[in-house]
């Protein structure tokens, strides 16, 4: 579904809260990706569908802000305009790892990557009370990322447009295409069976709604499906947790 007026109002509130003029205006990430019903999927980020990023090579799209110690998107206005770092964005890479996946000895971990040497980078093992699987690891990586993102954006009102990059197509599809339908159907999937990990994903979906629509929200969080080769930072963190 598209952005609601409530989400737009909260985003405008964040913009008006900025006291320091910016050299570059924010580029609002318009949703040009649609589902089979012609509805825009506002939590899905596809650079090729974004006019502010479609002409920027993938290798140049994300840059590290050494002052803020986090990753941000590059942007480019229409025409022969220079590329500049979009100060209103935040890019976070997440990944999960599981050794012995599908066995009683399985052990899973997560990694959250904000950039090279960033103090916000995080990793850890999944609690033993949580199912040890690759899918659970990806979901818990998202949970860890959202906690840090919320804290960062609360302390820095410039950070409004959040991109969560992951190589897990399951997670991207679940959180952008399916979760609202699953909620409407009480957690039952298209095959008439309970969706695995539904309760945890519903909890994170509600957190995303709170970050977007609540009085202190105004953040627009989108999921970005990336190739594994672009997710090496988060992957390394997840595996480091297993090696420790």
Predicted regions, residues:
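Short, surface-exposed amphipathic charged segments that create phosphate/polyanion-binding patches used
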Residues: 236-244
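RNase H-like nuclease fold core
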Residues: 15-17, 29-136, 148-152, 241
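RNase H catalytic domain
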Residues: 5, 13-19, 32, 101, ...
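N-terminal targeting segments with Sec-dependent signals, encompassing both cleavable signal peptides
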Residues: 1-2
């Amino acid at each position: 579904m598209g952005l609601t007026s409530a989400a737009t109002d909260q985003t405008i509130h964040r913009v008006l809260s900025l006291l320091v003029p910016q050299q570059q205006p924010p580029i609002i990430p318009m949703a040009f990706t649609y589902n089979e019903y012609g509805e825009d999927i506002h939590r899905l980020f596809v650079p090729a569908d974004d006019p502010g990023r479609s002409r920027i090579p993938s290798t140049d799209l994300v840059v590290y802000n050494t002052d803020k110690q986090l990753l941000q998107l590059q942007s480019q206005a229409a025409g022969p305009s220079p590329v500049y770092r979009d100060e209103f964005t935040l890019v976070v890479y997440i990944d999960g790892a599981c050794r012995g996946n599908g066995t009683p000895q399985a052990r899973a971990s997560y990694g959250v990557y904000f950039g090279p040497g960033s103090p916000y980078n995080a990793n850890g093992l999944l609690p033993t009370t949580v199912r040890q699987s690759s899918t659970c690891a990806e979901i818990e990586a998202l949970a860890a990322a959202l906690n840090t993102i919320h804290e960062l954006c609360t302390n820095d009102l410039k950070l409004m447009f959040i991109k969560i990059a992951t190589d897990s197509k399951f997670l991207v599809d679940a959180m952008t295409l399916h979760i609202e339908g699953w909620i409407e159907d009480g957690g039952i999937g298209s095959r008439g069976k309970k969706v695995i990990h539904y309760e945890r994903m519903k909890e994170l979906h509600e957190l995303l709604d709170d970050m977007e629509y609540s009085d202190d929200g105004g953040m627009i969080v989108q999921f970005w499906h990336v190739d594994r080769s672009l997710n090496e930072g988060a992957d390394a963190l997840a595996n480091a947790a297993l090696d420790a």
